[in-house]
């Protein structure tokens, strides 16, 4: 059968699979688009943009940042959570467009992106430490994220949180040379046992091993996580 005779939905599925699994998804999709009319139409489908593995195109960020951001915007418009996540951090950290950045991060979170939820929490807590009375609102938001389904929020288990933190830190390091500074170090807890190590964890090869610690409250738990994040970026 001639390829032009295949149903359009099958062509879209094939193209989306390439966008998802390819090591070089952008160049492969561009080549496919240029090959014939039927694939040009298939590559324009929203599903292809939604499935594009944009995290495999970081080299484009250094070679042609304008094109990289253009690809992210098109994919984010199609509902690609990773594209929304990276674009949100770019807007927030590099372009100082806080409202736009948070909007993209929220869009990613709504599509189940755990690192986006984590970053919204860290941003909220970071900002709250600059203003009296803001910490409680930030902590309520963080608890909302952590109590969400596993696909939509960061896990409160040590390993789950460390994994999400690594992902967030990795993107932050790739996107910007700017580093966050604590507006004000969190007030130490009066409980002498709060934050004490319960069980020692062997240091991971990447230096990101987390010990099991006991905290007296959700406030102290999140403040410790915030300090961990700042130290890593």
Placement of each model-derived feature along the sequence:
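CRL adaptor-proximal regions
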Residues: 1-5, 218-221, 230-233
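Skp1-binding F-box subdomain of Cullin-RING ligase substrate receptors
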Residues: 1-86, 90, 98-102
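A conserved position within tetratricopeptide repeats
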Residues: 40, 76, 92, 109, ...
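Short helix-capping/linker turns of helical repeat alpha-solenoids
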Residues: 78-81, 111-114, 127
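Alpha-solenoid helical repeat scaffolds
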Residues: 85-87, 118-121, 135-136
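Short coil/turn linking the two alpha-helices of tandem helical-hairpin repeats
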Residues: 88-97, 126-131
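TPR/TPR-like (Sel1-like) alpha-helical repeat modules
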Residues: 109-110, 114, 130-151
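TPR/TPR-like alpha-solenoid helical repeat scaffolds
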Residues: 120-129, 153-182, 186
């Amino acid at each position: 059968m001639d390829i032009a005779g295949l149903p359009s939905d099958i062509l879209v599925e094939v193209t989306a699979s390439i966008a998802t699994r390819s090591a070089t998804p952008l160049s492969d999709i561009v080549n496919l688009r240029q090959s014939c009319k039927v694939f040009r139409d298939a590559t324009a489908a929203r599903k292809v943009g939604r499935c594009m593995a944009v995290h495999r195109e970081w080299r484009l960020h250094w070679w042609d940042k304008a094109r990289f951001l253009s690809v992210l915007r098109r994919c984010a418009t199609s509902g690609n959570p990773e594209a929304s996540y990276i674009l949100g951090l770019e807007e927030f950290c590099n372009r100082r467009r806080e409202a736009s950045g948070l909007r993209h991060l929220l869009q990613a979170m709504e599509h189940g992106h755990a690192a986006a939820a984590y970053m919204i929490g860290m941003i909220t807590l970071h900002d709250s430490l600059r203003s009296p009375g803001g910490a409680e609102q930030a902590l309520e938001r963080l608890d909302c994220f952590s109590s969400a389904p596993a696909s939509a929020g960061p896990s409160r288990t040590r390993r789950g949180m460390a994994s999400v933190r690594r992902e967030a830190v990795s993107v932050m390091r790739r996107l910007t040379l700017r580093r966050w500074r604590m507006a004000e170090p969190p007030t130490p807890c009066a409980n002498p046992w709060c934050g004490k190590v319960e069980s020692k964890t062997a240091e991971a090869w990447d230096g990101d091993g987390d010990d099991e610690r006991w905290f007296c409250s959700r406030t102290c738990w999140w403040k410790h996580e915030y300090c961990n994040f700042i130290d890593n970026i």
